[in-house]
Each structure stands twice: as structure tokens, then as C-alpha cells.
Amino acid sequence: MTDSTVSSAKSDPVLVNHEERLGVHSLAVDAIDQVLMNSKLHYLGNAARIIEPMRHLAILTCMDARIDVSALLGLRPGDAHVIRNAGGRASTDALHALAISQAVMHTCEVMVIHHTDCALGRFSQAQLDEQISAASGHRFAEELGCFTDPIGAIAQDVASLRASPYLPARDKIRGFIYDLSTNLLTEVSSRDRTPN
């Protein structure tokens, strides 16, 4: 196969998808390029429109790839805003997203979903600092959201969001823990535990 043949094959999403289905990995295609190709095939002709989430719901959860929010909650595209970060913590960036979600897109309910076996519960701030520093040569000045008490962390995040003046709809903010081993979602009251 010549270089020009490889180049044209890489740009052919049908060929790449066919090879993926067959389990053939002869083409060196980056993961991002692959999902972009899949996106073009899957949504061909379906132009996106800016709409308010149909359920007026925002979900703050962890970036962990094991959590399929749509499958877990039975959501379809357009149902809810899904905001993800490390740990599903109520960080400044999460608050910004929720404030925009409520003010611009009129969401009025928030689910905060943490999960079992979360990296932020398994590593300390110092351990994560060390790993990030070793990989990048830099350290974050701010806390990364590590916790030792999962229930307390959810309670802390829910309480923090309920107290935020930037969220006009604060009465329907609820916290949950998702058990990865059982696939069960359990509600946690913000008064269940006091975080460490």
C-alpha cells in the first residue's frame, strides 16, 4: 500500500468503520479522528439546533468513562445538560456551567452524581499533585477536589450549590452516588454526613 493509498484510506470513514467492525487495525487512526468520522456518519444531515433541555435538568457528574449517563438515566439527546469534571465536584467551572444552564437555557433541577471507586477518593491531593507535576512539570495552585468520605463529598457539593447566589433555582438540587459494581443509583441527603 503506497503512502497516498494510506492517506486516502484514512480519510474514508466507511473503510475505517468497516475495518473497525471486522477488528482490523491496519490503519493508524487517532481516537479523535475515529470518533469524528463516526460523528459524520451517524449525524449526517441532522443539523443541531440550540434548544432548552426538554427535561429542564442539569446533571453534574464525574468524567469517569465507566459512567454512561444516558443509559443510566434513560436520557435521549436534548433531554438534559450533562456537565462532567474530575469527581463530579461543584468546582468553579461546574458552577459557571450550571449558572449558564439555568440563566440561559432555563434548567431548574440539578442532579449531582458521584460514584464508587472514584480516583479523587483513592488518591490524595499530594499524590495527584505529584503525578501531574511528573507528567507536565507544573502544579495547580488550587485544590483538585480529593476526598476521603464519598457521602460527605456529595453532601458538601449539594450544600455548596444550594448556597450559591449564581443559581436562581436552588430548591431542586439533589445528590446521588452511583455504585459501579451494582449499577444502583442511591440518593444522598445533604444532611447525611458532614464532610471531612
Question: Where in the sequence are the language-model features?
Answer:
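A structural signal for short, well-ordered beta-strand segments
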Residues: 59, 112, 174-175
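Ordered, amphipathic secondary-structure segments that act as subunit-interaction surfaces
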Residues: 106-115
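Divalent-metal-activated hydrolytic enzyme cores
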Residues: 2-53, 87-93, 104, 120-196
